Amino acid sequence: ILCYGLWKDYRYSQRKLADFCRKFAEYDERYFNKTYQKLVDELYNYTDWKVEHVKYTKDDYPHYKSKIMQASVEEQMRCANEINALSARYFTYGFCILIEDGFGSKKLTNFKDKAQKRIQSITGDMRTGTINDLWKELATGAGIYIEKPKID
């Protein structure tokens, strides 16, 4: 989502996208399995907003009498929470990199708003595509190939 938005909305070149991805990998290496609260605070101080992850609870999902169905729902909830926690972390990394690259508070907020709309377009009830569509367009249009995550 971040690279796609930078390419599509801000005309980042292949070189600038590759540099962004390199910096992102450095952040991930530096903060992997560590707290990143310092980054959250820096982002908030700069923009007056932060990327938050609100955990799903059992109240957000239907309850089934069947133990198998209920176990399936609980696993779905666990996976959704894990994905959302990583997404909050990764968006925070990306926004902090853009601050380093000179994005002002208003420009960064505009970028965040566009990213939220794009996420809604691929995950919401009225979705118009998938993350794979964006991934393919980024690979063919910008020449940036982003490895897909390996899922255990």
Predicted features along the sequence, with ranges:
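Intrinsic disorder/low-complexity detector
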Residues: 1-4, 35-97, 124-152
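Active-site catalytic microenvironments for nucleophilic, acid-base chemistry
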Residues: 5, 9, 23, 97
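Long, low-complexity interaction regions most often at the N-terminus
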Residues: 10, 16, 28-31
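Generic structural signal for well-ordered, non-membrane alpha-helices
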Residues: 15, 22, 92-93, 113
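Amphipathic alpha-helical segments that form the core helices of the histone-fold
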Residues: 20-29, 111-122
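Surface-exposed, Lys/Arg-rich phosphate-binding patches that contact polyanionic backbones
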Residues: 101
